[in-house]
């Protein structure tokens, strides 16, 4: 449906903006990155000219990348490159459960448990590739218990439906 496609397109644009913002921040690779035990409330809805969207937290995204040691969570042997600003391997944050579906959950999904670290190739594969279903399935099973610890309950079928898979 056209409305859903429009929402997902805007969701992807917001995620791209997050990626750009993170690229401009100097990251401390020696910091200890970890999950929080706190259940976070839903983020605030921000209105723009066209609709309302949920704000992404860049600190949470950076922490999620750090938890993964700035490597691709599909395969940590995937090639990355060093960022100009700080020499940290470049990976991209991806909300496994897209933020466009935040309304379906009682707590925030803009959390480290829902943000995976991906090499550019795998990130684009999830959005545009033939193997997106495989990648989403792999990540789902790796995150399912982490989701449940944050009172986020979602089936693989439901998650795949968010990606039209």
In which residue ranges do the predicted regions lie?
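Residues that form generic nucleotide/phosphate-binding pockets
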Residues: 21-24, 63, 67, 142, ...
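A detector for short metal-coordination/catalytic motifs
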Residues: 88-93, 97-165
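Short, charged surface segments at domain edges that flank catalytic/cofactor-binding sites
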Residues: 26, 30-88, 100-110
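Generic hydrophobic, helix-prone segments enriched in Leu/Val/Ile
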Residues: 3, 35-39, 62-67, 132-142
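Internal, Lys/Arg-enriched amphipathic helical interaction segments that engage polyanionic partners
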Residues: 1-34
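The canonical Cys-X-X-Cys-His
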Residues: 13, 17, 72-75, 122
């Amino acid at each position: 449906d056209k409305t859903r496609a429009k929402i997902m397109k805007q969701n992807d644009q917001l995620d791209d903006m997050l990626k750009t913002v993170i690229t401009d921040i100097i990251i401390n690779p020696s910091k200890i990155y970890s999950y929080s035990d706190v259940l976070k409330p839903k983020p605030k809805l921000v209105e723009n000219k066209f609709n309302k969207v949920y704000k992404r937290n860049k600190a949470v995204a950076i922490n999620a990348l750090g938890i993964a040691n700035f490597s691709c969570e599909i395969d940590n042997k995937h090639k990355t490159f060093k960022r100009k600003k700080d020499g940290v391997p470049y990976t991209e944050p991806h909300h496994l459960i897209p933020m466009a579906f935040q309304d379906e959950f009682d707590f925030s999904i803009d959390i480290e448990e829902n943000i995976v670290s991906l090499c550019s190739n795998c990130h684009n594969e999830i959005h545009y590739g033939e193997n997106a279903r495989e990648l989403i399935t792999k990540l789902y099973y790796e995150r399912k218990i982490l989701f449940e610890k944050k009172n986020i309950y979602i089936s693989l079928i439901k998650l795949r439906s968010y990606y039209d898979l």
